[in-house]
A protein has these predicted regions:
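Leucine-rich repeat
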Residues: 2-6, 11-233
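Innate immune receptor modules and recognition interfaces
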Residues: 15, 27, 97, 132, ...
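A structural signal for leucine-rich repeat
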Residues: 127-131, 155-163, 180-188, 203-212, ...
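Right-handed parallel beta-helix
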Residues: 194, 214-215, 240-243, 267-268
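Extended alpha-solenoid helical-repeat scaffolds
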Residues: 224, 243-245
């Protein structure tokens, strides 16, 4: 069969715009690919062999190995055998080791993304090696899928709490135990999903150790050493965006943590399955609040805490209230309200 023009090899002399670029530019372009594919470009030519070793972003995802196994066997993911499952993890961890050992300068990495489905082999590796954060990293995105269900949570390394250039941290299903001081002077965005905090002091130190924090998200986080009479106190003068969803104590699905927070510059508030929040500020209601969304959810909230909360957010210009909040039949004067949505 004759080869179509689509598959013709370019003739010598025809410009290759990508290859003509400087090595630094090509490495920068490769930084936007998942690391698995960036490393794969090494087979293109002798010149491309080491270009990936200068990428400024490392993006690991063992689900890409799932896809390779599935496509090679034309099999369903849920039918992978235990042997294949272990082989997948071994291949992935060897790949991670190869990247760490061959990268030219890990301290030059600006973005570190690590998304994996946790297994026993994965936990053993991470407990032994830890997560390698370069000292100059600016963004960290760690997701350990199924870690809590499998009881295989990974402890955050001590080095995480003193990363001077870190601006964005997104952590999913890890364990945070803060034994020393926290100094994250550049962190502006902190998002925690299903994070296990050893105690309220650990979480309080983490939050207050971010002097310019603007966005905080706590979703289904759990404080392991806290009872219903304890209060988590945090001062975040720079905070502008706050999201709290089902913040629990002692892994008890019915026991909500209580939070007292100083956030005088707060502009946007989203609460779901959580209303045990009190703002500590000299002026009440919150002076800078633009929007508030409150859903008491299926977990019971105390009448007093909800009354106090609604009074403190009554300065919002836009508000969304859910029916389960309305049935409490307690509303302060909403003197700045321009828009109200009832869901």
């Amino acid at each position: 069969m004759a080869r179509t023009d689509k598959w013709k090899v370019p003739e010598p002399g025809i410009d290759d715009r990508l290859t003509s670029l400087p090595d630094e530019i090509i490495s920068h372009i490769l930084s936007f690919l998942p690391t698995k594919y960036a490393v794969g470009t090494a087979v293109l030519s002798r010149r491309w062999k080491d270009l990936w070793t200068r990428v400024s972003n490392l993006d690991f995802d063992n689900r890409l190995v799932y896809r390779d196994l599935i496509s090679s066997r034309v099999a369903n993911y849920f039918r992978l055998t235990e042997m294949e499952d272990r082989r997948r993890d071994v291949e992935f961890l060897r790949f991670v080791d190869r990247v760490f050992s061959q990268h030219r300068n890990l301290d030059s990495v600006r973005c570190f993304r690590f998304h994996v489905s946790v297994s026993r082999a994965m936990q053993d590796y991470l407990n032994k090696r830890g997560l390698a954060f370069g000292s100059q990293v600016e963004e960290i995105d760690v997701m350990l899928l199924e870690a809590i269900v499998s009881q295989l949570c990974l402890q955050l390394p001590e080095s995480f709490y003193t990363l001077k250039n870190l601006k964005v941290a997104k952590l999913h299903e890890v364990k945070a135990t803060v034994n020393g001081s926290v100094s994250l002077p550049s962190l502006k965005i902190l998002e925690l999903w299903d994070v296990l905090a050893e105690d309220r002091e650990s979480l309080s130190r983490l939050i207050t150790g971010c002097p310019i924090l603007e966005t905080l998200r706590l979703e289904h986080c759990i404080l392991l050493d806290m009872n219903e009479n304890d209060v988590l106190i945090a001062s975040i003068p720079s905070l502008r965006n706050l999201t709290i969803i089902a913040f629990l104590a002692e892994d008890d699905d019915k026991c909500l943590c209580r939070i007292a927070m100083e956030a005088p510059k707060l502009e946007h508030l989203y609460l779901e399955d959580f209303t045990e929040l009190e703002f500590l500020c000299s002026s009440s209601p919150l002076p800078c609040l633009d929007s508030a969304r409150v859903d008491t959810g299926r977990r019971a909230s105390s009448y007093q805490s909800l009354v106090r909360l609604l009074a403190q957010i009554s300065s919002a210009k836009e508000m969304c209230l859910y029916w389960n909040t309305l049935v409490m039949n307690i509303f302060p004067l909403l003197h700045k309200l321009h828009y109200l949505l009832v869901v």
